[in-house]
Amino acid sequence: MSYKISRAAYANMFGPTTGDKVRLADTELFIEVEKDFTTYGEEVKFGGGKVIRDGMGQSQVTRANGAVDTVITNALIVDTWGIVKADVGLKNGRIAAIGKAGNPDTQPGITIIIGPSTEIIAGEGKILTAGGMDAHIHFICPQQIEEALMSGVTTMLGGGSGPAHGTLATTCTGAWHIERMIESFDAFPMNLALAGKGNASLPAALEEMVLAGACSLKLHEDWGTTPAAIDCCLSVADEYDVQVMIHTDTLNESGFVEDTIGAIKGRTIHAFHTEGAGGGHAPDIIKICGQSNVIPSSTNPTRPYTVNTIAEHLDMLMVCHHLSPSIPEDIAFAESRIRKETIAAEDILHDIGAFSIISSDSQAMGRVGEVAIRTWQTADKMKRQRGRLAQETGDNDNFRVKRYIAKYTINPAIAQGLSHEVGSIEVGKRADLVIWNPAFFGVKPEMVLLGGSIAAAPMGDPNASIPTPQPMHYRPMFAAYGKSLTNSSVTFVSQASLDAGLAGRLGVAKKLLAVKNTRGGISKASMIHNSLTPHIEVDPETYEVRADGELLTCEPATVLPMAQRYFLF
C-alpha cells in the first residue's frame, strides 16, 4: 500500500528529489535535481527506528561476497556529468557504485549491497562533489596542505622546497629537492605531485628532474622563458609524457606572444594565469586562450573582478617576485601586469567556457584555501551581470554549475594526466570526496574523504558528551594519521621515474602513481564544458579585449557572496 508525502516532508527526511531545487550557499545559483536513483518507499537511512537495520536495509552479505565498505546515502551529486540524487558505495578506497543501496534479500532494484561491515555516512540533504584539485601550488610551507584539505581540495600539484626565494616566486623543483619533497609527502593527508623546472635549452637537466619524480615541468619567466627553453622543455615532455605549465615573458624581452606561440609549435601546454596579472606577455598574453593546443587557467587572486582587485595586486606582486619599491624599473614591471580591462575580460571568458581551469598560486599571489570560493564567486557574479547561459534548458543554473565545477575538479586532472584516478565522481576512481551542507557549499565542507576514509571534518569539543559543542573547528580525522594516512593518499610521479626504480630508491610509504596522457592525446577540446577557442584581440593602447569581435567588459563587483557572512574573523 502506497503512502503519499509532501515534497517538503520528503526533502526534509530524504533530501531533495527529481525536480527539486537547491540554492548554493548565499549565491544566486540554483541547481535542480535531474534524476533520483532511489525507489520511492525503499530509501535507506541510518538511525534509531530507521531502515538500515539487520534484516531490513542491512543484509547478511559479507564484504568478501560483495557488501561495500561505506555507503553515502541519498546524496545530491554535483558533477560535470550530472546533478543527481543517489546512494554512493565505496570499497577498497574507490567508488564502487552509484545507484540504490540496501538489502537485495528484502528490497527491489538494489545495486549497492549494505552488509554488517558497511559504514554509513548520511548524505540526506547534503551535496557530494569530487575533491578539488589545485594545479598551481608553490610549496612554500607545509601548513598550506591542511588549509587546502579543509577547503575541500584533495589533490595538490606544484613545485618548490619551502620558503626559498625561488619557491616564493616559482613552482620549479630541482632533482635533489624533488626526492626530498617526495619523502616529506608521507606526512601529509593529501594527494601530491611535483613540477620540475622547465627552463633549460638542453634536455639533460630536464630529463634528470623527470627521472627524479617530477610529473610535470614548469616554464617560468623568472628563470627565463625563452623560445629555446620552451621548445626544449616541450620536446622532453613529449618524450616522457609529462605536462608543461608555462608562465611567459611579461617584459617581452625574448619575444612577444606570437613568438611564444611559434615556439610551442602546436604542442599541448597548460598556460598559467592566462589573463596576465599573474605574469605573462604584457598586455596580450590573454590571446593564447584561443589556441586549440593551449589549456588556459586562472589563479584565484583575480577571481572574480572586484573593486579591490587592482589595489591589492601591486603589493602582492612586489613581494612575490622579489621586486623593490625603490627601483623604478621594478615598479614599472609590476604595473605592466595589472590591467583592469583584461581582468574584467577574464570573468567573461570563464563564463563562456574559454578559460578552462582555476587554481590558487598559493602564497605567491593566491590563496590556497579559496579555490572553490573564488570559482563560485565568479559564477555568481557572471549570473548577476550576464544572466542565464544560453545552454541552460530548465529554470535552473545546472549547466553553469557544471561548467564551473569542472574548472577545479576534472579539467585540471585531465590537463595534468591524473583523470584516470581523480577529478570526478565515477565508478573506479579514488573515493576522494567532499560532503557539503548546501548553505555552506563551496565555503566550508562538512566532511572530506581521502581514499574512502574520513580525513578532515569540523568537530566540537573532544571532551563533550556529543560531537557538536563549541569550540567547533576543522580538525584532522583518522585518515590523517599513521599508516591510514599513507594508505589513503598517493603521490603522482612520471612513469619514467617508476621505471627507473624511484619507489625502491626512496623507500616511501605512500603509493607512487604515474601520470599519463598529458601530450598529444589531450588539447583544449578535452576540457569539459570549457573548450571554447574564440579569436582574441587586445588593443595595445586601451587593453580592451575582444572575442570574435565582441568587446568583453564588465563592472567590478562591490559585494560578493560566500564572504564575510561566513567568516567571523
From Swiss-Prot:
A cellular-component GO term for this protein: cytoplasm
Residues that bind substrate: 220
Enzyme type, top EC level: hydrolase
Binding site for Ni(2+) 2: 218, 247, 273
Family annotation (Gene3D superfamilies): Metal-dependent hydrolases (3.20.20.140), Urease, subunit C, domain 1 (2.30.40.10)
CDD domains: Urease_alpha
Cofactor remark: Binds 2 nickel ions per subunit.
Domain of life: Bacteria
Keyword vocabulary terms for this entry: Cytoplasm, Hydrolase, Metal-binding, Nickel
Annotated protein name in UniProt: Urease subunit alpha
Organism this protein belongs to: Rhizobium rhizogenes (strain K84 / ATCC BAA-868) (Agrobacterium radiobacter)
